[in-house]
Amino acid sequence: MSFKEEYQKKLKTADEAVKVVKSGDWLEYGWCVTTPAALDKALAKRMPELENINIRGGIVMWPLEITKIDSPADHFTWNSWHMGGLERKWIKEGFSYYAPIRYSELPGYYRNYIDHVDVAMMQVAPMDEHGFFNFGPSASHLAAMLEKADCVIVEVNENMPRCLGGFEEGVHISKVDMIVEGENPAIAELGGGGAATDVDKAVAKLIVDQIPNGACLQLGIGGMPNAVGSMIAESDLKDLGVHTEMYVDAFVDIAKAGKITGARKNIDRYRQTYAFAAGTKKLYDYLNDNPECMSAPVNYTNDIARVSSIDNFISINNAVDVDLYGQISAESSGIKQISGAGGQLDFVMGAYLSNGGKSFVCLSSTFTDKAGQMHSRILPTLHNGSIVTDTRANAHYIVTEYGMANMKGLSAWQRAEALINIAHPDFRDQLIKDAEKAQIWRRSNK
């Protein structure tokens, strides 16, 4: 049987395909831009007759139809590997929960600890001449997840970019049970957190001054990493490489400015390596069939040993809060879950262990609440219930618009002094009093 004949044999409508779902099932809903669309719509019609359904996914970028039914919590539970704004909203509605992970371990979770998946469904690129459906810009953990699925349903989207890789960037038709030709929606776009602010630019300048020619970059999402990317694109830096968890628009700008060659990378030379991507159409168009860009599973991109083997590795990520001990929360504010651990700790550790490498965790020194009250992001201790994403033992450079502090080798009082020095001036006196109370302040300190 040819691949085209097998394709026709497995072709179903979305309504036909979701009939396989039954109460009590564990479902997989892809990841990020591969979250199903037509299948989600079809399942929403059936969901009121189902109960005790568990669904795994993450970084949902548009409102899902299954969440629009009456009383979703009576029918299913959403289990998120990494939360976005919609999933935070669903927490309040009682059917969404975060699953704490080090993102790099996710393929191993499926292969070693998750017994099985009843039904996996996701959007993919059209089948190629060799019978493969490409995962688009989301290799991530999808190959490992499909290995555990009793039933694999792919939803073909003709707009899905075909993202080349080295391995585990797609699934062969022989491993697929049903094929649905979807409605071909445009690939969901993710903004970079708005235009860079003056604070973002100040932080970016401090970091860019620390980046040498030939460095290998990892950028997170948000205004500060975007500001760093814009500044790099306009700089005199050259021969930069990319080895990152998330590929964002800033990398496209840097590449088109001629700054990225990958010529000095110790591994995957001349290629930009990433686990998943989300951004604007500009990004998806750049990644499509681009042999310079290498889509790879997250246990490859985020492996600490692999990251540390790359010389001059520069990791740039965001934080929510930092306390005077150097503990970093990048995923919650108190008990309120904001995002997830992701791969930040892996890159913080890998960059530090790299020859010439540096990890930068960035944050604005303050934020203003809805009532107009300004608060310090550098705290005496993290808020009660806040999750420690990066421990004080792992923290490297912490950066605000007032400067950067290298935590390595510093005792408790030295850390307190260094962090107070980069806090907003309006909060420094109170932070000194808090440090004294915690017995991490010396009288000889300024």
From Swiss-Prot:
One of its GO terms (biological process) is butyrate biosynthetic process. The keyword Magnesium does not apply. CoA binds at residues 220-224, 320, 343, 370. The active site is at residue 245. InterPro entries: AcetylCoA_hyd_C, AcetylCoA_hyd_C_sf, ActCoA_hydro, ActCoA_hydro_N, Butryl-CoA_acetate_CoA_Tfrase, NagB/RpiA_transferase-like. Gene3D superfamilies: 4-hydroxybutyrate coenzyme like domains, Acetyl-CoA hydrolase/transferase C-terminal domain, Glutaconate Coenzyme A-transferase. It is an enzyme of class 2 (transferase). Pathway: Lipid metabolism; butanoate metabolism. One of its GO terms (molecular function) is acetate CoA-transferase activity. Keywords: Fatty acid metabolism, Lipid metabolism, Transferase. Its EC number is 2.8.3.-. Coenzyme A-transferase that converts butyryl-CoA to butyrate. Can also use proprionyl-CoA as substrate in vitro. Belongs to the acetyl-CoA hydrolase/transferase family. Butyryl-CoA CoA-transferase subfamily. The fermentation acid butyrate is of special interest, as it has been shown to serve as the preferred energy source for the gut wall and also influences cell differentiation and apoptosis in the colon, and this seems to aid in protection against colon cancer and inflammatory bowel disease. Formation of butyrate via butyryl-CoA CoA-transferase is the only available route for butyrate synthesis in the majority of human gut isolates. This is Butyryl-CoA:acetate CoA-transferase.
